[in-house]
């Protein structure tokens, strides 16, 4: 190499200086040696520059060659990888690649499992809907049967009450006829200006006392109530002088289109009400039927009773919403 040759020459020159220290006798020889060493140094510097340039060119050539080889290898590697990918893609399309077949088998297995589970879930949903439909049908039938029984009981109670009232009317027909005769006589006397009893003072009577200012139906109901009370207490419990006072109409009560209007409020079937009677504790009940002259209700213990609208008008009973 140029640098090594130069160092070798310098080392040789030093050896020469060391080898001839004793030849100090001739100065001419020293001058010749100095001139020869100077020429050799000039030639060696020129050779070193040429060698450096030549080596630089060689290095550049080698670098370009290596870059070309690297580029060729990179292109070759890209083509090989591309060919491998294309081959693998063809295998996948042909269902032959193991990397594709194994996940595909897992996916198909999962699909079969999920399809089976979905089928079972569908059957369960259908069964649940069918059971719900059957339950609704059964509930509707039971509701219909209960409504039929309730309607039957209501109609039966109404008919029995009408039969009972007819029986009572049949037994008390003679009494009512006497009442009618008395009423007619009293009207005739009021119309007759020359009647001697017109200015007669009121007579205090004992026993049931009936006010004839009421309607005929109210009189009949009051008389029936009095007879029931007398029959329940018995003849030995009846006090000798008891005056029954009929209260005047103090409340507004009427039946319109299957509803009851009482003291400015409307009451309908199925509503829960509180029934208040004098000298008794209030009770809650549910309205079952509203007729033209009576209201049927059902108590909490299951017993059924009725109220006459005239009783509400007189204030014997009072009702209110709960």
Curated annotation (Swiss-Prot):
A Gene Ontology BP annotation from the UniProt entry: negative regulation of transcription by RNA polymerase II
Gene Ontology CC annotations of this record: Sin3-type complex
Molecular function per GO: histone deacetylase binding
Acidic residues: bias regions: 17-51
Residue ranges that the Swiss-Prot or TrEMBL entry lists as coiled coil: 50-99, 147-178
Keyword field: Coiled coil, Nucleus, Repressor, Transcription, Transcription regulation
Disordered: region residues: 1-56
Subcellular location: Nucleus
Biased composition (Basic and acidic residues): 1-16
Family: Belongs to the BRMS1 family.
Role: Involved in the histone deacetylase (HDAC1)-dependent transcriptional repression activity.
Name used for this protein in its record: Breast cancer metastasis-suppressor 1-like protein
Gene name of this polypeptide: brms1l
């Amino acid at each position: 190499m140029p640098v090594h040759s130069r160092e070798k020459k310098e080392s040789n020159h030093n050896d020469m200086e060391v080898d001839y220290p004793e030849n100090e006798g001739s100065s001419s020889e020293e001058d010749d040696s100095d001139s020869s060493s100077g020429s050799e140094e000039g030639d060696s510097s020129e050779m070193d520059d040429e060698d450096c340039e030549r080596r630089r060119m060689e290095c550049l050539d080698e670098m370009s060659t290596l870059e070309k080889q690297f580029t060729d290898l990179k292109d070759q590697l890209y083509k090989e990888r591309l060919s491998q990918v294309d081959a693998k893609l063809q295998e996948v399309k042909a269902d032959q690649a193991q990397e594709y077949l194994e996940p595909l088998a897992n996916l198909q297995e999962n699909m079969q499992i999920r399809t089976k589970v979905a089928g079972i879930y569908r059957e369960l949903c259908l069964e649940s809907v069918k059971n719900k439909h059957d339950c609704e049908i059964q509930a509707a039938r039971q509701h219909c049967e209960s409504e039929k029984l309730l309607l039957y009981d209501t109609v039966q109670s109404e008919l029995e009450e009408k039969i009972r009232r007819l029986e009572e009317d049949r037994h008390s027909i003679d009494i009512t006829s006497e009442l009618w005769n008395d009423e007619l006589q009293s009207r005739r006397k009021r119309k007759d200006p020359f009647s001697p009893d017109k200015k007669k003072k009121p007579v205090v009577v004992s026993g049931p006392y009936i006010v004839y200012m009421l309607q005929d139906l109210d009189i009949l109901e009051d008389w029936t109530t009095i007879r029931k009370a007398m029959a329940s207490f018995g003849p030995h419990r009846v006090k000798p002088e008891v005056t029954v006072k009929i209260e005047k109409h103090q409340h507004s009560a009427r039946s319109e289109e299957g509803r009851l209007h009482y003291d400015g409020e409307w009451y309908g079937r199925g509503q829960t009400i509180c029934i208040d009677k004098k000298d008794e504790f209030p009770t809650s009940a549910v309205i079952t039927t509203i007729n033209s002259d009576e209201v049927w209700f059902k108590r909490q213990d299951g017993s059924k009773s009725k109220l006459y609208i005239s009783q509400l008008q007189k204030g014997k009973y009072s009702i209110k919403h709960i």
